[in-house]
């Protein structure tokens, strides 16, 4: 799932669901980085997109945390 799939509905999920999304993206990022180091990665643009998706979700989580205080 790349940024195109992260819509407002995903950002309206609970914090637990967003944290699960972050873990899923981090696992996928790890896999892509491993493939990159081995030399079998064909779509290197996905690494950048997933890193940005993780940042977007974490930004939303931090905004919620600061808003709750």
UniProtKB/Swiss-Prot annotation:
Recorded GO MF terms: structural constituent of ribosome
SUPFAM superfamilies: Ribosomal protein L29 (L29p)
Keywords from the named record: Ribonucleoprotein, Ribosomal protein
Classification via InterPro entries: Ribosomal_uL29, Ribosomal_uL29_CS, Ribosomal_uL29_sf
GO biological-process terms attached to the record: translation
Entry GO terms, CC: ribonucleoprotein complex; ribosome
Signal sequence coordinates: none
Protein name stated in the entry: Large ribosomal subunit protein uL29
